[in-house]
Amino acid sequence: MKRVWIVGLLITLLAGAKFGYEYFYFDQNQVGINGYVNPPAKIITLPQIPADGLSSIVVTPEAVQQALNDLGIPAGKVDGKWGQRTRQGFCIWRELTGRKPDRNYPIEFEQREIILLSKTKKSFALNEDFVKGLNVNKACQSVIWVKDGARKDYEISIVSTGASATPTNVGTFKVGWKVNRWYESISIPDGWMYRPMFFNKGQAIHGVESDNYVWWYPASHGCVRLLGAFVDKLWAADFGEGDTVRVYGEYNPVTTDPKI
């Protein structure tokens, strides 16, 4: 009788442990704490040697940063220090490779993949969600400017969208009007906008007095802050009235880095 009781207790404890693991490690959609779906073996398991050149790649923080920049993904200085700009780059890379866009550090396999992509000079295939125009991702604080209907010609840059108290609205909009000079906001005294293009009432894409104000987090009064040189490119390409601005995603300040 005592032996039966002990066996029953062990079964109960094992069942409880399994429930606890599944409840706390995965959410209701079976998405792991690092964003990996249940997590797929191809992401968390290193390849056998050799496997498409992945295993022979020497991984360093500097090499990963350089690879992101070579892929056209802004990732800050190549200094071996993974700061907030590098996190932005990881987020953009995840979006472009069909992963959940977050700013967590990549695991070793992903670092190897980033470097391999840059060495093979492969381009990303944008899916049909991307519109011809500006695609502003609030999760990454980034913009992908798609210049053609085939989604082959595009350029990536960084942005700073509206802070939590004054968020940039999510949706697909059209530029209604633009001003080709410095323009002071009507609602924000001394709020100067460089060559703004208004797409949603008072919300505009525009440059700022210093590119340093294009933070890696949402910090504007509702507009989409852009780098000055990027704004100049938009004007030079005659981007404006009737062109599309798509705003999507949600910024998450929390990062959960894997052990690497």
Which residues fall in each region the model found?
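Gly/Pro-biased beta-strand-loop elements
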Residues: 121-214, 259
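Sec-exported extracytoplasmic/periplasmic mature domains
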Residues: 66-74, 91-99, 148-151, 180, ...
